[in-house]
Structures are given as structure tokens and as C-alpha cells.
Amino acid sequence: MDPYKYRPSSAFNSPFCTTNSGAPVFNNNSSLTVGARGPVLLEDYHLVEKLANFDRERIAERVVHARGASAKGFFEVTHDIAHLTCADFLRAPGVQTPVIVRFSTVIHERGSPETLRDPRGFAVKFYTREGNFDLVGNNFPVFFIRDGMKFPDMVHALKPNPKSHIQENWRVLDFFSHHPESLHMFTFLFDDIGIPQDYRHMDGSGVHTFTLINRAGKSTYVKFHWKPTCGVKSLLEEKAIRVGGANHSHATQDLYDSIAAGNYPEWKPSIQIMGPEHEDKFDFDPLDVTKTWPEDILPLQPVGRLVLNKNIDNFLYMNEQLAFCPSIVVPGVYYSDDKMLQTRIFSYSDTQRYRLGPNYLQLPANAPKCAHHNNHYDGSMNFMHRDEEIDYFPSRYDQVRHAEVYPIPSTVCSGKREKCIIQKENNFKQPGERYRSFTPDRQERFIRRWVEALSDPRITYEIRSIWITYWSQADKSLGQKLASRLNVRPSI
């Protein structure tokens, strides 16, 4: 055994306690003092090391999606889509790929209850033979905003007041009163499904539009969806209060206990596809993340199944150090020009480097399971042992070569540099259609939640009026009911 390559594989591989450097500890109960009652000596390195390590146990919390739970499993292809993509993990029915999935709430802190009204993260990391693929989505198929320039401000508005650290409706509704594209997302968040019963009983969505590329180089727009085989279940407010009051980690425990009992959660992945040549045929922009694609025109097509059959065995390594980035794709899957997706391509990898360090992809949960090779060396917390002499490319002493060329989208882009909004905003049609699809009692609960939110005493008459105007444009009767209950007229 090479002692320079040896690393402990377990905390229990020594019969006695040791320091971090391996020295035996004969007393892990008492500090080193001058006499039985004298002062503690600074030279007690074991004490100093123990306290210093304890002081640094917690790593930086995620800015969003801090509260989460993870599980391992597999993705299996059940339907052939090789005509759409050259992605190796989608090459044929029956192919299985190991995955790790992280579910989360979005806005609230790491220890917050899992019964708060909040979107839920649904992120899947595929460990494919051609590298990792991160599909970083939510349980809702749309988002609040369509341009990443607004993302920091949006998160600030949703987070607690920086003065009082209290999350307040007036801040949220003030910000989004400037962004009517958020209405569609609010028809999900303020709906009954705004509080999922647990992680097993909720949908998943890739949210953004991605691109599939086949071996011939043909590109197809795609949206990814996950449907739970056990159905979607949610909590109404009264039950959410009871459940959260009894156990603030109820969804994490439900996921863990279900897998431990052999009741493996399963989802049916499906896709919607669209040829780029058809994107101008709709009354909305298909790359607008605040919109859904109509399923009657672009139906869901089954792809496979996702099964979670193994619990994680270390929360820090497999949940807190688990890092997802929409930029991590594989041959056959690519991005689109969705403005929010383009922003997340940079932002997510950047926040992981801040939170976990520049070598976060060496951590066990994030490292690819396939062979990999590059000349990315050193840096903070680099723990990969390498003994090569060649750390540059190309070299006649190193036989590594370029991989076989694989197709990427060949879209021709032209236009002038400008900062502008998209042409087809169409902010009110889909929110109105979704509201009208609710049953009368579901509509009533939706209205009641909005009345409560708009009744915040710090919300001005102007802001209430703007929101009623927005909802009136989505559905006239909805706007009238809100105006009547709040005694406010629309602003137009």
C-alpha cells in the first residue's frame, strides 16, 4: 500500500480515537489542564482541533433550494427516441442509467418546515457513459420571470426583509406588480398544489426548453416532464399547519421511510417536442419560460421510468455537497435560447464554486462515473491524486486526443446588440385558461389566498389596483371578485 495515496474509507476503521493526523487519543473526555481544577492549556492540540473542526462543520447554505432531501436510483428508457437524439443514455429501450435526485423547497432556509407554500425543486443528475447530465427543474412547468437579469431582485423580494428578517407579502407583491408575466406561475403557487403533500406525490418539470440533436444533426426543441405513478397529492392550509407543526421534516422522512420499506417512488418521464421551424406558429414564444406548451397540439410522449430505490448514507456528501448545474449536458442534449436558461448556465456553476470550491466536481456526488481526462489542475481543495508529467494539450508524449465529433445545433444567429423584451409577451391568456380549468371550490380557495395576500396592511391601494387589473385581464370574473372583496377598482 502506498501511504501517500491512502485515505480513510470509514470513520470506524481504527479501534480507538485519533486526531485528524492519525495520532492516538487516550482521553476524549477531558481537556488538558494545570492540575484537576487549573486553567485549560492552549497546547492541548486535540481540544483545539476538535473545536476548530466543530466550528467549521457547516458549509455555506444554498441561496435558493437550501432545504432539500436526496435519494439514489435509476432511469430506464422504455420508448425509443433515438431518432430525436444521439444521447447515449437514451440510445434504446431497456438502457438503465444511475441517478441521484434532490427535492427541495426554493425560498426558505435549510431548517424550515417542508409544509410552506413554495415551489419545489426537482433536480436529477444522470451518471451516463458520456458524462453527467443535470436536469435541474421544479415541480411547476413555468417560472416567475423570463429574463435572468431580474433573478437576483426576484430572490431578494421573495426572501425575508433584510431589516427584520421577516418574509412579507407586501415585498413580494410589490416586486411582481412590475412583472405581469408572473401571473401564470402564481396560478400554480396559489393553487391547491402550492403545498405538495410530500416529494413522492408531486410532478416534476425541466421547466426550460432544451434541444435534442440526432446523429444527422437535426435539432428538435424539447420540454421534459415527470409524472408520479402514485399521483399528485397536496396539502390544504389547515392540514399543512398540523403536519408541519408535528414534524418540520415530514417530506424528507416520508421519502426516506418509503425507500427503506421497499416502497420505491417512481415517475414516468415524458417529453414534448417541437421543430424549431414551428416556433413562430404560436401566439406566444415557445422559449418563454413563463409559458406552457399546449398538450393538445404538442402531446406528452412517454420516454422511460425513474425509480428511487436507495437512500443516501451521508447527508453532507450526498445532499449538501450535491451540486446541480443546467450547463452540464451530454452529446445529444443542448440548450436553447431561453433567456432564463442562458442565465442559469453561468449562475449555477458559479454559485457551486463559491459554495463548495473550484473543485466541486471532484466531490463523490458530483464526479462522473465514466472515465474522464483534462488538464484542470490544482486549486483549493483539490484532492485528486495525479502523477502525470504532461499537463498541457496537445503533446506527443500523451496520446490523449480529441473525441469523435458529435453534432450541436447549427442555428444561424443575426441581429443587433440590444436589451429588450420578447415580442410575444401574451401574459394573461394562459393564466386565465388555467384559472377557468379549476372547479368552483378550487377557484374559491385561489381567490381566498389572493385576498389574504393583498390584505397585507403595507400594500398600497395602487398595488392592489394593479393586481386586480392583471387578474381582470386574465379572467374578468376573477378580477371582479377580487375587486369586490377588497373594495378596490382596477387601475384601467
Curated annotation (Swiss-Prot):
Its cofactor is heme. The keyword Heme applies. The active site is at H65, N138. SMART domains: Catalase (SM01060). It catalyses: 2 H2O2 = O2 + 2 H2O. GO terms for molecular function: catalase activity; heme binding; metal ion binding. InterPro entries: Catalase, Catalase_AS, Catalase_clade1/3, Catalase_core, Catalase_haem_BS, Catalase_immune_responsive, Catalase_sf. GO terms for cellular component: cytoplasm; peroxisome. Heme binds at Y348. Its main location: other. Keywords: Heme, Hydrogen peroxide, Iron, Metal-binding, Oxidoreductase, Peroxidase, Peroxisome. Belongs to the catalase family. Homotetramer. This is Catalase isozyme 2.
